Amino acid sequence: MKNSMLEAASLLLEKLLLISNFKIFSVCAPGGGTGKKHPYEINSFLRGDVLEVSRTHFTHYGIYLGDNRVAHLMPDILLALTSDKERTQKVVSNKRLLPGVICKVASIRVDTVEDFAYGADILVNHLDETLKKKSLLNEEVARRAEQQLGLTPYSLLWNNCEHFVTYCRYGSPISPQAEKFHETVKILIRDQRSCLASAVLGLVSIIYTGLASYMTLPAVCIPFCLWMMSG
């Protein structure tokens, strides 16, 4: 029962995070950058470096493999629709990205630096400073990334691009972005002033989706579950 409650709470958190990023996916170019050509100093990147590109409300990460290749985790609905590599290897568009997030379909793929960054400025190994963790040797980082290439389940909270690079770089998958969002939601739900807002949100969900039992129960119980798991 406890696991079911946590799964329901997890699902709500993911949907909230998805909604918060919906505008980003809708109005930005693929990957969230400007799409404009940007002169990248590829020769300054070392195999195994973590490349980081800032977005409006989130950050995207990848592992540099050398020879203008970056391994990164990307949601892509096309992976569930076809096995044609010629189609799936093309740069992931917004029309493929958002449905991929919703359906939790993704892959760890290799793109050029330009396609990965899509016009955004690149930071190199910035996570080393922000996380204050000792990194593995660059060659080991790159090997780990190469071993992960291929299909992977996607989760905004538990298996995103940041989890991928931190596993490769430090040996354990973590995502400060997801953790920060998770803590923020717990604080809001735990705050008594948010109880009414949570109830209204549940009521709106029921009205919008209908009174189907599979939606009614989560809409009523999830705010309570979140409060219970806030410890």
Swiss-Prot record:
It comes from the Eukaryota. Its EC number is 2.3.1.135. Pathway: Cofactor metabolism; retinol metabolism. Inhibited by all-trans-retinyl alpha-bromoacetate and N-boc-L-biocytinyl-11-aminoundecane chloro-methyl ketone (BACMK). Gene3D superfamilies: endopeptidase domain like (from Nostoc punctiforme) (3.90.1720.10). Residues 50-177 form the LRAT domain. It is found in: Endoplasmic reticulum membrane; Rough endoplasmic reticulum; Endosome, Multivesicular body; Cytoplasm, Perinuclear region. Keywords: Acyltransferase, Cytoplasm, Endoplasmic reticulum, Endosome, Lipid metabolism, Membrane, Sensory transduction, Transferase, Transmembrane, Transmembrane helix, Vision. Its main location: endoplasmic reticulum. The chain crosses the membrane at residues 195-215. GO terms for molecular function: O-acyltransferase activity; O-palmitoyltransferase activity; phosphatidylcholine-retinol O-acyltransferase activity; retinoic acid binding; retinol binding. GO terms for biological process: cellular response to leukemia inhibitory factor; lipid storage; maintenance of location in cell; positive regulation of lipid transport; response to bacterium; response to retinoic acid; response to vitamin A; retinoid metabolic process. It is a single-pass membrane protein. Induction: LRAT activity is up-regulated by dietary vitamin A. Under conditions of vitamin A depletion, LRAT expression in the liver is induced by retinoic acid. Residues 1-194 are cytoplasmic. GO terms for cellular component: endoplasmic reticulum; endoplasmic reticulum membrane; multivesicular body; perinuclear region of cytoplasm; rough endoplasmic reticulum. InterPro entries: LRAT (IPR042288), LRAT_dom (IPR007053). It catalyses: all-trans-retinol--[retinol-binding protein] + a 1,2-diacyl-sn-glycero-3-phosphocholine = apo--[retinol-binding protein] + an all-trans-retinyl ester + a 2-acyl-sn-glycero-3-phosphocholine; 1,2-dihexadecanoyl-sn-glycero-3-phosphocholine + all-trans-retinol = all-trans-retinyl hexadecanoate + 2-hexadecanoyl-sn-glycero-3-phosphocholine; 1,2-diheptanoyl-sn-glycero-3-phosphocholine + all-trans-retinol--[retinol-binding protein] = all-trans-retinyl heptanoate + 2-heptanoyl-sn-glycero-3-phosphocholine + apo--[retinol-binding protein]; 1,2-dioctanoyl-sn-glycero-3-phosphocholine + all-trans-retinol--[retinol-binding protein] = 2-octanoyl-sn-glycero-3-phosphocholine + all-trans-retinyl octanoate + apo--[retinol-binding protein]. Hepatic stellate cells and endothelial cells (at protein level). Highly expressed in adrenal gland, small intestine, testis and eye. Lower levels of expression are observed in liver, heart, lung, skin, mammary tissue and skeletal muscle. The active site is at H60, H72, C161. Residues 216-231 are lumenal. Belongs to the H-rev107 family. Transfers the acyl group from the sn-1 position of phosphatidylcholine to all-trans retinol, producing all-trans retinyl esters. Retinyl esters are storage forms of vitamin A. LRAT plays a critical role in vision. It provides the all-trans retinyl ester substrates for the isomerohydrolase which processes the esters into 11-cis-retinol in the retinal pigment epithelium; due to a membrane-associated alcohol dehydrogenase, 11 cis-retinol is oxidized and converted into 11-cis-retinaldehyde which is the chromophore for rhodopsin and the cone photopigments. This is Lecithin retinol acyltransferase. The gene is Lrat.
